[in-house]
């Protein structure tokens, strides 16, 4: 019999289960933090990257301005030192009563300037030199910048230069009427004054010209050098080294996504799939000419609408394609930009592909223009093409595309073409006993999302721990939560839906209570549908009365697409109907059941318009054919998402499994044996349906244990279970009228469905195992975050907190606040706390360690002493009277007992509060309902959403010990280790 591992993988959790010979041996949960900023969804590395970029940008600007100051000092015989600032003081050249540089830039066009004023004009323009390359800005910022540049360009038409425009439009008006102050420069998050760099360069050239005419003497070389230095731009790196290798030819690089050949390949794929679907559902056969007609339309215009497609294929306008949405069947926006920029040309396909490759990889405009000059292009074409923004690649190379597309032009599908060419994805032949790191595999270039990478890393950690403990297995079943692979905004939308769903359920619970209905999942769902359907039956249109809701036999929840045919148990596939309507519908879609009755069907169409779009489409679907049923069912049983297939293939290709037996059940509706599949990606819809059918309550997302329940269900979701489940649902749908006539009780119904449980007493066995789980969390040892807060403050701002100047000096000495470049800042994160114990009194003391300490490589040695607001006590030096116990990091596991508790409890360390010398800790599973009497003393302010204890004073703890928890939740006492310093 099979040894099976199962995993429920989320973006911050891993639920797992191990079964052997159908016996549930073990299960558990691993919780970890998402690799992103929880408030914004931005990368954790983004603040460091932005700070580093800002430092580099400022350093380059400083170097550029210093170079200009040297040039100006030499040419104008000025003192270079006068233009340098020391200790953040104003440079000597700028002291005194000076004219505004905006006014000087205007005067420079009309009168001779002094050497000092001309120097100020040059440096002012060079310091704020406008926008040049905004191709790589994010879309939101770029749009705002381009809009402002265009608006200012229109206004500049009335002025000689940018300086004159800014002076007259803003500075002079303010000078004349000081009540209406308007900033000349942009302030934070404002783009109103954005100017193209080319206009500022033209202004400086014009000023040089005018000053020469007015009699200012300077060399031509000086002018050229100033313009060169002032507007110098470092060449941007290309990204060719980051491009992954072809899936078929590993020595070839992947083809750019926005190349003509790639567009043709994508268009062919979509068109062939559409034509094949029409063949399978309508029995219509299309020729190669039809394929080419559609393709030529796409390649000519870059778009193909659904309306055009229907016309070209001879279909009626009201025909609806599978998954038809919006106006366009195919829309290649980048391809349209490409053909527009090219205009008329005589270039061949290879040249066009290479041009697209250059645009994708070369980000520096000057370098790109040089590269484009190699082709038969005029200057206008080069300029237009260099403005395009291309990124991303396919998984295959030009070499592979050139082999595959000719066969696809004959009408062959992508997989058929690959089979005919004997093209096989490069696979790993060296299988291992343990799964290697993701970045050591062929798939390393497939994922760059840090959230997904962390989830994969933790999955590997848990998997390898299980293999080490239990040995090799026959099969691994995986389910990926739907948020895995989604970006932050998409996940926020999912979370919003879940919260709304939770609220709707709670509201329905209250309504059940008011109506005297049993509070169970069935009645809650009935009430939700009752409200959504405006109190009407979805099929008959009859008004549903409160008395109908109170009568268990009057109403039923119907699957719009029959469950046995679709395996769709989602809310969007459910409606509330009178039992009689459900008896008539049986194992059919609404159209199959009621479509022949035109009057009734018209009524159903009207009723459906008041429902959500997804539900409306299901009800009105007239073409739910057998082939679609199989596709729909397969999608609902197996996870076909890209990220799920990636994790599946990563596991399958690199892990060595036990051989599978030949007598295992075959897959439903398939000739291939399921026994030959070592790794399967299960759908969340299947898990949800089995969870409900096997009697597990709805997920409580506030505690972590539901991940393990899902993993157990995934472990037992084998082919025989799925077949038995499908047969049961089919019988339930087909015999609905008969079952109702016999008045089969709810208890009989529950007993009837037990026959396909994995083993007798399955539910209770699982719940018993779940109760044994200790949730695992990785200790977060790595220092991360800013060294200090961004805001620099005056010393006086801290006087109240620390009791005047002396208190501030003491706070600086103790490291509570820091001095950076003469200014005071608040500390960054406290990433570690070192715990000491007094040798005589046995009291505990804590030495906080901040990211700044780590950066300075200075290990603090003073423990926090509690102080009142407005004063600061000396911290306590950890000398020979104290002994080091252990270091705590976020999510360290500790055993603690306060003086009021009867026994110690395991908790996870969350944070240390230095002002109160206390801990913040949390319960491992965050489950409120199972708090013991002893735990309630510790977690006195816990609630359903958060089981956290704050203000746990450390000095008088009866028990305070550190433990280690493995990836599988095994707890062992931490061995004593010497206090760890910082490597220099």
Write out the residue ranges for each language-model feature:
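Generic, well-ordered alpha-helical scaffold segments in large soluble proteins
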Residues: 71, 358, 407, 455-469, ...
């Amino acid at each position: 019999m099979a040894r099976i591992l199962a995993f429920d993988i989320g973006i911050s959790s891993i639920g797992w289960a191990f079964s052997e010979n159908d016996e549930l041996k073990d299960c558990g949960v691993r919780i970890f933090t998402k690799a992103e900023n929880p408030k914004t969804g931005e990368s954790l590395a983004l603040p460091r990257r932005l700070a580093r970029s800002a430092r580099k940008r400022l350093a380059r600007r400083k170097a550029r301005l210093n170079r200009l100051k040297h040039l100006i000092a030499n040419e104008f015989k000025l003192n270079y030192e006068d233009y340098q600032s020391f200790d953040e003081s104003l440079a000597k050249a700028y002291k005194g009563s000076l004219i505004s540089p905006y006014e000087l830039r205007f005067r420079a066009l009309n009168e001779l300037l002094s050497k000092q004023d001309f120097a100020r004009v040059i440096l002012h323009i060079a310091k704020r030199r406008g926008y040049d390359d905004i191709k790589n800005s994010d879309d939101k910022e770029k749009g705002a910048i381009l809009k402002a540049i265009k608006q200012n360009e229109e206004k500049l038409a009335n002025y000689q230069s940018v300086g004159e425009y800014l002076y007259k439009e803003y500075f002079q008006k303010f000078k004349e009427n000081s009540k209406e102050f308007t900033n000349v420069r942009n302030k934070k998050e404002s783009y109103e004054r954005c100017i193209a760099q080319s206009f500022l360069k033209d202004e400086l050239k014009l000023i040089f010209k005018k000053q020469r005419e007015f009699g200012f003497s300077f060399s031509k070389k000086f002018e050229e050098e100033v313009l060169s230095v002032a507007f110098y731009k470092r060449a941007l790196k290309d990204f060719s080294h980051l491009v992954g290798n072809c899936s078929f030819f590993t020595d070839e690089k992947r083809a750019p996504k926005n190349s003509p050949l790639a567009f043709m390949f994508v268009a062919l794929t979509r068109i062939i799939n559409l034509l094949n679907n029409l063949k399978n559902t309508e029995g219509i056969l299309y020729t190669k000419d039809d394929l080419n007609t559609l393709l030529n339309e796409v390649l000519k215009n870059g778009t193909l609408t659904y309306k055009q497609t229907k016309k070209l294929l001879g279909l009626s306008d009201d025909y609806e394609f599978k998954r038809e949405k919006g106006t366009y069947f195919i829309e290649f926006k980048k391809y349209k930009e490409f053909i527009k920029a090219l205009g008329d040309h005589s270039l061949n396909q290879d040249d066009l592909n290479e041009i697209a490759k250059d645009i994708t990889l070369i980000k520096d405009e000057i370098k790109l223009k040089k590269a484009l000059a190699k082709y038969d292009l005029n200057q206008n074409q080069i300029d237009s093409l260099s403005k395009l923004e291309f990124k991303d690649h396919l998984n295959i190379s030009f070499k592979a595309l050139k082999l595959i597309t000719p066969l696809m032009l004959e009408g062959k599908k992508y997989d058929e073409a690959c089979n005919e060419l004997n093209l096989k994805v490069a696979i790993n032949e060296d299988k291992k006993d343990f799964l290697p790191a993701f970045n050591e595999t062929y798939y390393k270039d497939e994922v760059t999302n840090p959230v997904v990478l962390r989830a994969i890393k933790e999955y590997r950690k848990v998997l390898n721990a299980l293999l080490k403990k239990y040995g090799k297995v026959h099969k691994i079943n995986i389910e990926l939560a739907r948020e895995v692979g989604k970006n932050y905004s998409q996940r926020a939308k999912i979370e919003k839906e879940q919260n709304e769903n939770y609220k709707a359920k709670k509201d329905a619970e209250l309504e059940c209570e008011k109506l005297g209905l049993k509070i169970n999942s069935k009645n809650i769902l009935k009430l939700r549908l009752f409200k959504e359907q405006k109190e009407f039956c979805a099929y008959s249109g009859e008004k549903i009365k409160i008395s109908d809701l109170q009568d268990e036999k009057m109403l039923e929840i119907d699957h719009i697409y029959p469950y046995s045919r679709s395996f769709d148990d989602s809310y969007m596939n459910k409606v509330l109907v009178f039992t009689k309507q459900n008896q008539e519908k049986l194992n059919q879609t609404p159209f199959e059941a009621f479509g022949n009755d035109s009057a009734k069907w018209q009524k159903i169409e009207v009723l459906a318009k008041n429902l959500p779009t997804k539900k409306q489409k299901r009800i009105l679907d007239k073409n739910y054919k057998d082939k679609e049923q199989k596709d729909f069912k397969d999608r609902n049983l197996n996870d076909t998402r890209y990220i799920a297939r990636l994790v599946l293939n990563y596991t399958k290709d690199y892990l060595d499994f036990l051989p599978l037996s030949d007598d295992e059940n075959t897959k439903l509706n398939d000739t291939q044996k399921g026994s030959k599949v070592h790794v399967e990606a299960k759908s969340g819809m299947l898990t949800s349906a089995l969870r409900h059918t096997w009697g597990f309550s709805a997920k409580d997302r506030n505690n972590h244990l539901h991940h393990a329940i899902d993993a157990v269900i995934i472990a037992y979701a084998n082919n025989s279970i799925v077949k038995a489940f499908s047969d049961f649902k089919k019988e339930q749908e087909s015999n609905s009228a008969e079952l109702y006539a016999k008045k089969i009780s709810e208890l009989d119904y529950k007993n009837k469905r037990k026959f396909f449980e994995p083993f007798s007493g399955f539910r209770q066995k699982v719940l018993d195992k779940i109760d044994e789980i200790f949730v695992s969390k990785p200790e977060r040892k790595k220092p991360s975050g800013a060294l200090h807060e961004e805001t620099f403050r005056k010393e006086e701002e801290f006087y109240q907190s620390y009791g005047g100047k002396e208190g501030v000096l003491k706070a600086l000495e103790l490291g509570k606040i820091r001095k950076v470049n003469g200014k005071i800042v608040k500390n960054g994160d406290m990433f570690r706390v070192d715990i000491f114990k007094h040798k005589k009194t046995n009291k505990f003391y804590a030495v906080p360690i901040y990211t700044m300490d780590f950066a300075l490589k200075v290990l603090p040695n003073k423990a926090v002493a509690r102080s009142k607001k407005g004063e600061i006590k000396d911290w306590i030096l950890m000398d020979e009277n104290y002994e080091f116990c252990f270091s705590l990091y976020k999510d360290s596991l500790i055993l603690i007992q306060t003086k009021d508790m009867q026994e110690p409890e395991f908790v996870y360390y969350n944070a240390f509060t230095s002002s109160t010398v206390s801990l913040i800790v949390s319960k491992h599973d965050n489950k409120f309902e199972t708090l013991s009497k002893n735990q309630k003393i510790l977690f006195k302010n816990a609630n359903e959403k958060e089981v956290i204890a704050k203000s746990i004073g450390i000095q008088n703890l009866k028990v305070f010990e550190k433990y280690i928890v493995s990836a599988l939740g095994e707890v062992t006492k931490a061995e004593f280790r010497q206090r760890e310093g910082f490597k220099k």
